[in-house]
Amino acid sequence: MMKKILGVIPARYASSRFPGKPLAKIGDKTMIEWTYRNASRSSVLSELVVATDDVRIHEVVQKFGGRSVMTSSDHPSGTDRIIEVANQFSEYSIIVNIQGDEPGIEPELIDGVASLKASHPEWAMSTAAVPLLDFSHAIDFNRVKVIIDRNGKAIYFSRSLIPSQFKTTVPLYRHLGIYGYDRDFLLQYNSLPKSNLEESESLEQLRAIEAGYGIGIYLSKEAGLSVDTPADLEIVIEDFKKRKWISE
């Protein structure tokens, strides 16, 4: 029996670096609409919803024909928002957390992460990575690195350079912020003790690693552009013009 898969796009208005980011315009559409429409091209999602704590985002999504659910404004992380939504949609066995600040997200990335989780019920989660070819990016603390074992499972995530390249040059991989969760694991995630590694690296997924849960890695060919600041938005706008998605 095919597992039912729910895609969730968390969207906050009150971003410290870019307030109102989901409603920023790229051509004639908001960023959240671009993200939603591109994510909806996935071939494996049974349903796609935006999860937001802001009525302005909620109304915009409904206006362009998307599905949106209102969530609490007290969540300390995007994962907590996903958990609230998972509790509302009990019929789905896999929940995919899709970042709302990647308006050009490729549906193949969503399909890869979701399908990997569906084919490995023994893993609690799946996520994605991309080969890291620029060494300046490898030593950038804002770009999370991951080491992958021979079975395609994550060994460790870090903001530091891993592996160290001390004696031999080996491939490096950058983590991409998309997650496929086993529903039962997701609902008990907050009951896991906070990890020292999680606190040290400021990476939530290390809570699962330290508790002994498996995280599968889907290898993508390239990373999409994400928007953290208004300057990032301008880069995305230029990229969309090159793709002919918006006019000059």
Curated annotation (Swiss-Prot):
Pathway this chain belongs to: Nucleotide-sugar biosynthesis; CMP-3-deoxy-D-manno-octulosonate biosynthesis; CMP-3-deoxy-D-manno-octulosonate from 3-deoxy-D-manno-octulosonate and CTP: step 1/1; Bacterial outer membrane biogenesis; lipopolysaccharide biosynthesis
Primary location group: cytoplasm
EC number: 2.7.7.38
InterPro entries: Cytidylyl_trans, KdsB, Nucleotide-diphossugar_trans
GO biological process: CMP-keto-3-deoxy-D-manno-octulosonic acid biosynthetic process; lipopolysaccharide biosynthetic process
One annotated Gene Ontology cellular component of this protein: cytosol
Tree of life domain: Bacteria
Cell compartments where the protein resides: Cytoplasm
UniProt-listed CDD domains: CMP-KDO-Synthetase (cd02517)
Keywords of this entry: Cytoplasm, Lipopolysaccharide biosynthesis, Nucleotidyltransferase, Transferase
Molecular function terms, GO-annotated: 3-deoxy-manno-octulosonate cytidylyltransferase activity
Catalytic activity: 3-deoxy-alpha-D-manno-oct-2-ulosonate + CTP = CMP-3-deoxy-beta-D-manno-octulosonate + diphosphate
PANTHER family: 3-DEOXY-MANNO-OCTULOSONATE CYTIDYLYLTRANSFERASE, 3-DEOXY-MANNO-OCTULOSONATE CYTIDYLYLTRANSFERASE, MITOCHONDRIAL
Classification via HAMAP family: KdsB (MF_00057)
Function: Activates KDO (a required 8-carbon sugar) for incorporation into bacterial lipopolysaccharide in Gram-negative bacteria.
NCBIfam families: kdsB, PRK05450.1-3, PRK05450.1-5, PRK13368.1
Family as reported in the entry's similarity comment: Belongs to the KdsB family.
UniProt-recorded name of the protein: 3-deoxy-manno-octulosonate cytidylyltransferase
Species of origin: Leptospira interrogans serogroup Icterohaemorrhagiae serovar copenhageni (strain Fiocruz L1-130)
Gene, per the UniProt record: kdsB
